[in-house]
Amino acid sequence: MAKEKFDRSLPHVNVGTIGHVDHGKTTLTAALTRVCSEVFGSAVVEFDKIDSAPEEKARGITINTAHVEYNSNIRHYAHVDCPGHADYVKNMITGAAQMDGAILVCSAADGPMPQTREHILLSRQVGVPYIVVFLNKADLVDDAELLELVEMEVRDLLSTYDFPGDDTPIIIGSARMALEGKDDNEMGTTAVKKLVETLDAYIPEPVRAIDQPFLMPIEDVFSISGRGTVVTGRIERGIVRVQDPLEIVGLRDTTTTTCTGVEMFRKLLDEGRAGENCGVLLRGTKRDDVERGQVLVKPGSVKPHTKFTAEVYVLSKEEGGRHTPFFKGYRPQFYFRTTDVTGNCELPEGVEMVMPGDNIQMTVTLIKTIAMEDGLRFAIREGGRTVGAGVVAKIIE
């Protein structure tokens, strides 16, 4: 079968299902592909195929994730679904599957459960900006008051973690019904159609990397006689043009400079764009003023910091992580973008030790500044070996 041509005309949005085990995340994922194929002509993906998700490696961590795609009238959605709870934790912390919005699936028959809470907390910690709720298995609940009660509980839970619980859209339905093509009381296909319309309306179109302020992690520094200093790296976001003023942030005091040239594959360009590997020629910057690990940014867009709270996943022994727990006062290296910086870990109140395979919130104090923003990913390393993955939840100073 010929591969379908990827349609670039529709804006692309990344979503995913989250929620407690057996509340119907995978069934809803399959139902979404089915309903969208009938209404909007995208491909159907069967339940079993999603459920036996292939293993992937992200930063050396094994994660099972299923990726499906579907279209609405106005968008192309890429959707991730994970089979196990541990996969969600790893996926969200490593950012292996970035989400512009999440679909929280909660069984109307059971109400919010421990993982419902944990996935909402994780979404808050890793910066998932929007959550839409699908109250599933509503066909099993005869009592309208019970449905209202569950809805209130879910709204309260969202508000607890700083999501707008009162304004969050909640769709009531049955994923299984939709998957079987049924629609009694508009709980099947109609509910899923409504969910897609809600995704369209409630999750704003993400700002593309190229439209964000310029940032390039510096990987290498060269001196070219007669021309000056060139820094190389892959542009993470934005555009850099010749004559743009720039700042060099992190590891030392912030300095300002000007881009006097952009080179790619030994050709001179007027600009470099997000996703491109290039060299940026800097005016008046000496070879020794810059080092790997700093970032080149649009002035004022990113600040250097040393202290932050983070959500961290500690690799298990099987994943090549530590064999033993660590305790408070643990001082590993934190690998941000292109370099390691040593930092001290404070554990939450009442937590004495952290076991391999755990996920935990911690407060980190680095010995040098790093250009950082909420949502920045990092690896935790001991002498070059990755032992954990984390994400900056909140900058303190």
Swiss-Prot record:
Superkingdom as given in the UniProt entry: Bacteria
Catalytic activity entry: GTP + H2O = GDP + phosphate + H(+)
Region G5, annotated ranges: 174-176
Region G1, annotated ranges: 19-26
Binding-site positions, GTP: 19-26, 81-85, 136-139
InterPro entries named among the record's database cross-references: EF-Tu_GTP-bd, EF-Tu_GTPase, EFTu-like_2, EFTU_2, G_TR_CS, P-loop_NTPase, Small_GTP-bd, T_Tr_GTP-bd_dom
Example of a GO MF term: translation elongation factor activity
Xref: PROSITE patterns: G_TR_1, G_TR_2
Pfam family, one: GTP_EFTU
Residue numbers spanned by region G3: 81-84
Subcellular location(s) per record: Cytoplasm
Top-level EC class as recorded in UniProt: hydrolase
Stretches of the chain forming a coiled coil according to its record: none
Segments for region (G2): 60-64
UniProt-annotated binding residues for Mg(2+): 26
EC number: 3.6.5.3
Keyword annotations from UniProtKB, A to Z: Cytoplasm, Elongation factor, GTP-binding, Hydrolase, Magnesium, Metal-binding, Nucleotide-binding, Protein biosynthesis
tr-type G domain sequence ranges: 10-207
Any single GO CC term annotated in Swiss-Prot or TrEMBL for this entry: cytosol
Main location, first listed in the record: cytoplasm
Renumbered residue ranges of the record's region G4: 136-139
Subunit structure: Monomer.
Family: Belongs to the TRAFAC class translation factor GTPase superfamily. Classic translation factor GTPase family. EF-Tu/EF-1A subfamily.
Annotated function: GTP hydrolase that promotes the GTP-dependent binding of aminoacyl-tRNA to the A-site of ribosomes during protein biosynthesis.
HAMAP family, sorted: EF_Tu_B (MF_00118_B)
Name of this chain's protein: Elongation factor Tu-B
Gene source species: Pseudomonas putida (strain ATCC 47054 / DSM 6125 / CFBP 8728 / NCIMB 11950 / KT2440)
Name of the gene this protein is made from: tufB
